[in-house]
Design a protein with these regions (language model features):
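Cap/insert and terminal regions of metallo-dependent hydrolase folds
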Residues: 30-32, 40-43, 51-148
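Core dinuclear metal-dependent hydrolase active-site scaffold
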Residues: 1-60, 146-152
Length: 152
């Protein structure tokens, strides 16, 4: 079938070099986007960075056959806890996977294939067999891997 792509706004923040003293961390300004790839009746939504999941974005994702979604950090304070950074995930414009308003909870119930991508090297879901990896897999998510191919 014919292939098409459409950009859509995703809550996020501006690039670090554009930040002022008090940057908007979950703004929908168009500075942060996702892309929907459409092939015939099949749809893939790619959201490499997301600071939140408002109803309109969840509705868009609900119709996708495949969702590739930001999984930068498992917990919001992961960078601080591991000593690898001073900012929380939300401060960097990324929802954590865990927690009541994290990615696992907010994407729960959506159909289709849900694949986690844009994974920071501190994120324990990268470790096969870790409790965090088992948690995301039990929730119906896949962890993206280098060289992964997706057929719509």
């Amino acid at each position: 079938g014919e292939l098409a792509a459409e950009l859509f706004t995703v809550p996020g923040k501006v690039a670090l070099y554009l930040e002022g003293e008090a940057p908007a961390l979950a703004a929908e300004t168009g500075a942060n986007v996702g892309v929907e790839i459409i092939c015939g009746a099949r749809r893939l939504a790619y959201v490499p960075g997301a600071a939140g999941l408002p109803p309109a974005l969840r509705e868009r994702l609900a119709g996708a056959d495949v969702i590739l979604f930001d999984a930068t950090l498992f917990t919001d304070d992961e960078m601080i806890a591991t000593g690898t950074g001073a900012k929380t995930g939300r401060r960097m414009g990324h929802m954590p996977l865990d927690g009541a308003d994290g990615t696992l909870a907010t994407l729960a119930g959506l159909g289709g294939r849900r694949i986690l991508t844009h994974i920071n090297n501190t994120n324990p879901i990268l470790i096969e067999g870790s409790s965090e990896r088992r948690q995301v897999e039990a929730a119906g998510f896949e962890v993206a891997a280098d060289g992964m191919e997706i057929v719509l």
